[in-house]
Amino acid sequence: MIHPAARRVFVFVPLIAASLAAQTATYFPSRGHWAPHQSPAELGFDPAKLQEAVAFAQANGSTWDFDRDQVRTFGAVLGPLPKQRAVTNGIILRHGYIAAQFGDTKAADPVYSVAKSFISTVCSLAVERGLIKDVNDPVARYIQDGGYDSPHNAKITWKDHLQQESEWEGTLWGKNADFVGAEQFGRGERKAREIHDPGTFYEYNDVRINRFSLSLARLFGKGLPEVLKTDIMDPIGASPTWHWYGYFNSTVEINGKPVESVSGGTRWGGGLWIDSEDLARFGLLILNHGRWEGQQIISAQWLRDATSPSAHGPDYGYLWWLNTQQKQWPHAPKSSFAALGNGSNCIWIDPDHDIVFVWHWYRNAALDGMIERILAAVQQ
């Protein structure tokens, strides 16, 4: 549905233009409260066309079923899964205001690999604090838990992990990084192949991302959910309903205390469970170069680096999906980028039009069509 504010009577075009000119400053919602709301017309949208986009989204909800699809697609489950999920839901922001929303946007569900972009953002804090001197440094220089002892793994840098080019070898939480074996990996199993040097080959690989997550937890000396909550989610006014889970067997000892190492997705259960409204806040933070009102929470330089394509990935940055070649989403600007997860789930960010679009539980092939319709609704 179009946001209730859209039901106001139409105003003359000069008044709309004046409204747009007056709202050059981005609106940042306070904790638990997203107001004042603006109508689509006041935000530069054609209300009828925006309603068409919402109708398209509602017609393209996911058919994903945890009981039917999870194990056969991904293999043996290691962590929690919800008993049921919400239906498709989402939010369209412009200039920080809600232009449209649909479905239950307060349903905190797993977002699968959207969590990877959160790991990237948490890593930025380690760099800013000097815990990581340079992303080109070998991880082994910082982490001595046996995971980087081999001559091959000793070459892996933080940047290799960030770009999914680590080629880390080993087993973590009962899953081998080679993804060989249907029991453990379901339809996602892969054939054995030659391992390449770190930094020379891209492979989307959750075992290696989970290794990266564990390394960051050891570096911070605490669980990543604690870091995320204290340094990112609380400052942007996120709700208390989100949770970031690991696996039933992923608890380690750090500084003499048990810490659950969290996963970079929900492929084997666990992962980040979060609602569309909190995802929209996070997306708004990223859209505004890491700044929330007067506070610089994430380094703007980090975000520039994170949204620059790697040498070997499929238009991929630091665990963010890019569109520099306009292959991901042909109807989207080259500057747009996204956090993507199975299900499907996304945070799509469009700096050219100052838009954040969050979509929970949609058919993967529908995203470009949805983007096309959102942008067709933009008038100015």
Q: What kind of feature is each model-predicted range?
A:
Residues P240, Y245, S250-T266, S308-V356:
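Active-site Gly/Thr loop motif
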Residues I98-K106, W168-F248, G270:
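Catalytic-site signature segments of enzymes, centered on catalytic residues
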Residues S117, R208-S215, G270-R291, N345-W361:
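Active-site-proximal alpha-helical segments within enzyme catalytic domains
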Residues D46, G96, P110-V135, H161, ...:
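Active-site SXXK
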